[in-house]
Amino acid sequence: MNRPKPLALIIMDGFGLSEKSDGNAIKQAHTPNLDKFFEEYPDTVLDASGEAVGLPEGQMGNSEVGHLNLGAGRIVYQDYTRINKAIEEGTLPENDALKNAIQHVKDNNSALHLMGLLSDGGVHSHINHLFGLLEMARVKNIEKVYVHPILDGRDTPPRSAEKYLNQLEEKLAELGIGEIATVSGRYYTMDRDNRWDRTKKSYDALVLGEGLEASDAISALKQSYAADKSDEFVIPTVIKKNGQPVGTIKDNDAVIFYNFRADRARQITKALALEEFDEFERPAEHPENLYYVCMAEYDEEFNLPVAFPPLEIKNGFGEILSKEGFKQLRIAETEKYAHVTFFFNGGVEKKYPGEDRVLVPSPKVATYDEKPEMSAYEVTDKLLEKLDEDKYDVIILNFANPDMVGHTGFMDAAVKAVEAVDECLGKIIPRIVDMGGQVLLTADHGNSEKMKDSEGKPHTAHTTNQVPLIYIGGPEGVGVKPGKLADIAPTMLEILGLDTPEEMTGQSLLTR
């Protein structure tokens, strides 16, 4: 096979496949270009969710996970799955960071605090991970265990917390260990937008025992509902017994924050655990000699113990291109720029030699249904300019529209989003083929193909549906077979005539 120049991987973010037309923005959109590509070129389907991308079975895919798998050429096991495995295999008590936290509590005759999002949403945390930690504390005979549940209502229904609080109370009773000490909504404890007044409310409840008060967790929830505040918005509430807080965070204690997603775990971690902190004034009671464990790495500059540090991905697609002296271009609008750079490169911020990046600003609107085309036309113009330079061997391009507009739940807007992408593909793809290039057209997960749930209400989440793969401009007689996202990098390496490194366990999907 002659080496194409350029070889482009085009990712239509949130573009899944479904036979249903009802609520399917992709089927309802007018897409003459995509229709033509599907008709004229070999196509197949890829798995983009669950175990095929390193998530638990049945878990919908997402953009971070999708791009990690696309760039790594192997299934990248997510923190969620790694923690599940450790619990299933009984290795949690042997984890260094967790073992040290237990030892710290024993040495100081102090308390262990378990804090995290209490739900089975699986996006930031999972209630089973809390249960695994409680079982570990019981096996290790820790006497003082306090739980600080953060209520969800975003990755779960808005008023579903009672179910999870009941499950937690039952688990504590079954194990004969631990008490619930505070209850708060994620709006406060998990803020990520530098609204430090929210973080401070959580801090005050955790450290000072100040805030709303209740005699138990369910009462705390009920008084919040009575004030018309759903799970996410529960004001930090201190559980009191005999007029005293059940358990505040004190000197020499240990905290395990069991959220595995970093972005919403950083602010409260800074406030509780970092020596240098000036977002608000911390009180004299600020805990000294606190052993604070992050379940995953929230920020390497925190220098805190991490239970499940990031896995290093050696010989990803971008790294191999660079070693071979190939020139590569990564291009996307702001919303998906990190995905075609940081995540595609295996969660590494550094740019490889020979890798150029183009960031096109996303439009400044409150929600993207107001501008469903987003910056797709600008991304397209920028790419066409870059094609004129004729210097890139490989291009990685992301169109954000089907995902970001799909999240709004507005069907008409999602249809327009898909049509905008179709129009852009009609300009880009023929141009690449005319240059002697080839295109792999795919997606990272589903979204826009399901805009309605079973009750006919707006559906705003990702899906577990398969995604398409179309191989455009390839040699006569070469097709593609079904696979998973991790098979894309080995497929591209074969097209480029490069060997697949042993670290890549994905398979080339080319058929002859």
From Swiss-Prot:
Keywords recorded for this protein, A-Z: Glycolysis, Isomerase, Manganese, Metal-binding
Keyword Metal-binding set for record: yes
Record-level GO cellular component terms: cytosol
Catalytic activity: (2R)-2-phosphoglycerate = (2R)-3-phosphoglycerate
Entry's cofactor comment: Binds 2 manganese ions per subunit.
Cofactor(s) this protein cannot do without: Mn(2+)
Keyword Manganese among UniProt keywords: yes
Database matches in CDD domains: iPGM
Record: residues binding Mn(2+) 2: 13, 63, 444-445
Complex formation: Monomer.
Official protein name in the record: 2,3-bisphosphoglycerate-independent phosphoglycerate mutase
